[in-house]
Amino acid sequence: MIILGIDPGLARVGYGLIDCNMTQKKMLDCGIIKTSQDHNDGERMVEITRDLRYLINKWKPQIASVEKFFFYRSSTTIKVVQARGVVIMTLARFRVPILEFPPMQIKLAVTGSGKANKDEVSMAVIRELDLSKPPRPDDASDALAIALTAYYQQRIVK
């Protein structure tokens, strides 16, 4: 099963793809979708949609896992939530089932602690996927952690 993890953002959307079965998991790809600061928000949303469509067509994920937010205070946060909506819409258009996890659940799933910091999450991703170095940038590492959370949840369900 191929799982696509997404760490949403307007300037950068982290993505991580893992291939897994009940006993094994490996990283296929990870990186970021970087949008142009010179573009308006609408054009940036189009960039996210275009690049996410490319990833879906290339890898054909069976499940997508997206970070869920519980705060809506600043204008920056609103833009991130809007970008997250574009991600959800694009996945839905391709009929990719979507799992959503809050940050604390992601940290708990990959490190054993819901209060883990970025370095601890990154080290857990390295260990769990048997990587030689941390995925960069942090958004890509976070996206792999989000994909791993879906993997663990699916193993429990099955």
Swiss-Prot record:
Its cofactor is Mg(2+). GO terms for cellular component: cytoplasm; Holliday junction resolvase complex. The active site is at 7, 67, 139. Coiled coil: none annotated. Keywords: Cytoplasm, DNA damage, DNA recombination, DNA repair, DNA-binding, Endonuclease, Hydrolase, Magnesium, Metal-binding, Nuclease. Mg(2+) 1 binds at residues 7, 139. InterPro entries: RNaseH-like_sf, RNaseH_sf, X-over_junc_endoDNase_Mg_BS, X-over_junc_endoDNase_RuvC. PROSITE patterns: RUVC. Gene3D superfamilies: Ribonuclease H-like superfamily/Ribonuclease H. It catalyses: Endonucleolytic cleavage at a junction such as a reciprocal single-stranded crossover between two homologous DNA duplexes (Holliday junction). It is found in: Cytoplasm. Mg(2+) 2 binds at residue 67. The keyword Hydrolase applies. GO terms for biological process: DNA recombination; DNA repair. The RuvA-RuvB-RuvC complex processes Holliday junction (HJ) DNA during genetic recombination and DNA repair. Endonuclease that resolves HJ intermediates. Cleaves cruciform DNA by making single-stranded nicks across the HJ at symmetrical positions within the homologous arms, yielding a 5'-phosphate and a 3'-hydroxyl group; requires a central core of homology in the junction. The consensus cleavage sequence is 5'-(A/T)TT(C/G)-3'. Cleavage occurs on the 3'-side of the TT dinucleotide at the point of strand exchange. Belongs to the RuvC family. Homodimer which binds Holliday junction (HJ) DNA. The HJ becomes 2-fold symmetrical on binding to RuvC with unstacked arms; it has a different conformation from HJ DNA in complex with RuvA. In the full resolvosome a probable DNA-RuvA(4)-RuvB(12)-RuvC(2) complex forms which resolves the HJ. This is Crossover junction endodeoxyribonuclease RuvC. It comes from Prochlorococcus marinus (strain MIT 9211).
